[in-house]
Amino acid sequence: MSNLIFSLNATMPIFLTMILGLFFRKVGILDESFTSKMNKFVFKIALPVLLFQDLSDSDFSAVWDIKFVLFCFFATLLSILAVWGLSHLLKERSARGEFIQAAYRSSAAILGIAFIQNIYGNSGMAPLMIISSVPLYNIMAVVVLAVFRPEREEITADFVKKTAKNIVTNPIILGIATGLLWSVLRIPKPVILQKTVQNIAVLATPLGLIAMGASFEAKSAAKNIRPSIAAAAIKLVGLAAVFLPIAVILGFRQEKLVAILVMLGSATTVSSFIMAKNMGHEGSLTANTVMLTTCGSAFTLTFWLYLMKTLAFI
């Protein structure tokens, strides 16, 4: 019973905060415009500042773990390749890009940090997990959505250059890189700067979760519902079932294992829908998968945490 309570204490506050966001949207406290701006603020300011704070305050040599970084990178890469292979079971070629992206692309930044903070009190290994997986998420999302685009256009040098620039200038990546550099150079932080950074960083998790909940659209879309269910099952259960045992065998425990779980088994990020629409896809498969995984992850993540706690891995 204590293990179940531990798991519920880790997951329920996260999802209740998201539900509050949905409630605030329904009663008119938040509207679409404000929610969009809140999402942008969290993505471009609060979340990078939080990551900068945690990394800049830590000893880089103690935080860096090449084994963990490589595992996250290759687990992400193999997950994408496996889902790409499975996508060929879909008859409609134009749906494959959405299926691949929705089945592998986690909300690693907001949910990952929220879970690890909720359990351990700080972002822990989340920044290293993010720097190993998020750039690959973005690169491969562009690739698969371009390759399986309904009105496919040639992938030119300018297209590749623009994509590379977007990845390098990603605010989350910049926050991590700046924090790591600050830690390596051991630059002192004046009290005024430290407190200002803390005041902004503390906004990231609650605002991010509220915005995620407020962005949720429970639209019923019969089209593509079966591949959406398949993508959700892969996202919440399949990838974690394959790679978590490998992570355990390799010796990952505690916050590292929780970070790996979130990378593999958390909900599909809402930004995947935005990217799919902006790259010429219809979007219903992605929207359905975001909806299913957001609802389902409240139960599946609780199950995974309960299982790992019972087995004394966390």
Per-region residue spans from a language model:
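Alpha-helical transmembrane segments of multi-pass small-molecule/ion transporters
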Residues: M1-I314
